[in-house]
Amino acid sequence: TGHVVQTYILCRDINPLEASKTGADSTICGDCVMRGTPTTDPVRKIAKNRKCYVNLGQGVLIVWKAFQRGVYKTGSARDMGRGRFVRVGTYGDPAACPASVWEDLLAEADTFTAYSHQSGWRPDIAMQSADTYEQATAHWSEGRRTFRVITGLEDLDKTKETLCPASKEAGRRVQCTACKLCKGSSLAKSIAIVEH
């Protein structure tokens, strides 16, 4: 990704592992199918069949614990984003926050990346996360750009999508900080990446 301001959307009073396991993460991830199924299994630490690429036991949990200890200072979102590259929703869906938060943070940002599983949420800010080709075509018909994980190169729709330039399959030509394709509305093609 490169040097980026990372934003986390977290449950204030429930650690990310517990939020996943109990389903409380719906408040920050909406109806994303990658969340998995809540469980009461005492052996499990997270939801069953969770497919989200974000590892809750690493960065997300560390950030949540630091927040609980009061490590993070408060300040102006506009100042925090000014002249910087911002990753909207490193964890959590940006639709879970008031749009004014993102408007302030991104107002003077150099650029940003953003994705949402919530259909039609702020296409000026976020690319639409599509889990299937059918979902992608539905979003394209509404004029929305998508970000889609594909199982192989043969799944790429070359008329509507391009491979993520930072991906192994595209030769890791550029980091996100230089690419700047993954942000809301633009004339660029939608982005796809082979699952890893």
Regions found by a protein language model. Give the residues of each.
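Class I S-adenosyl-L-methionine
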Residues: 1-196
